[in-house]
C-alpha cells in the first residue's frame, strides 16, 4: 500500500466528515438556532462548532496536500486531488471572508439582540458552501478509486 493511497484514504475520511458535518448543520442545527441563538453559543451551553470544524478542516487540508505530494507522479490522481483542494480552498476563503466573522458575531451576541431574520439570512447563504465540500468529497473518491486501480 503506497503512501499516496494511505493519504488519499485519510483525505476521503476527512472529506466525508466535512460533508456529514455540513449536512448536520444544514438539516439539524440551522433550522432551529435562528429562533434560539443560545444553541450556537458555547458560553451559554450551546454547541461549540469550532471544536469540530477546526480539527476536521485542518486534518483534511493536511491529508489532501500530503496525498497530492505523494501522488504527484500519477497525473490522473493528481488532477482529482487538485479539484478537491481547490474546491475546498474556495469554500474556506469564502468562509473566512464572509461566514466565520458573522458566525462569531452571532456566537458572541446577546441572544435577545439577534433577529430571526438576520440569522435565517445567514443560514440560507451558508447552505451554498455545502456543494463545494461535496465536490471535494467526490474528487477525493475519484482520486482514491484511481489509486486503487494502480
Question: Where are the predicted features?
Answer:
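Core segments of transmembrane alpha-helices
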Residues: 54-68, 129-138
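Mid-bilayer segments of alpha-helical transmembrane spans in multi-pass integral membrane proteins
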Residues: 89-97
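Membrane-proximal soluble regions of multi-pass membrane proteins
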Residues: 116-124, 129-132
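Juxtamembrane boundary at the C-terminal end of a transmembrane helix
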Residues: 142-150
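Interfacial loop at the N-terminal end of multi-pass membrane proteins
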Residues: 3-64, 100, 104-120
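Interfacial segments of alpha-helical transmembrane regions
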Residues: 2-16, 69-90
Amino acid at each position: 500500500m503506497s503512501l499516496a493511497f494511505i493519504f488519499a484514504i485519510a483525505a476521503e475520511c476527512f472529506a466525508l466528515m466535512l460533508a456529514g458535518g455540513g449536512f448536520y448543520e444544514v438539516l439539524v442545527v440551522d433550522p432551529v438556532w435562528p429562533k434560539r441563538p443560545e444553541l450556537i453559543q458555547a458560553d451559554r451551553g450551546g454547541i461549540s462548532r469550532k471544536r469540530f470544524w477546526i480539527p476536521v478542516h485542518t486534518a483534511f487540508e493536511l491529508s489532501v496536500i500530503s496525498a497530492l505530494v505523494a501522488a504527484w507522479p500519477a497525473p490522473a490522481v493528481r488532477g482529482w486531488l487538485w479539484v478537491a483542494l481547490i474546491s475546498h480552498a474556495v469554500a474556506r476563503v469564502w468562509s473566512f471572508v464572509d461566514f466565520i466573522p458573522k458566525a462569531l458575531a452571532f456566537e458572541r451576541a446577546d441572544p435577545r439582540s439577534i433577529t430571526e431574520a438576520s440569522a435565517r439570512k445567514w443560514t440560507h447563504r451558508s447552505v451554498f458552501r455545502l456543494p463545494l465540500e461535496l465536490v471535494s468529497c467526490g474528487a477525493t473518491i475519484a482520486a482514491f478509486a484511481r489509486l486503487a486501480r494502480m
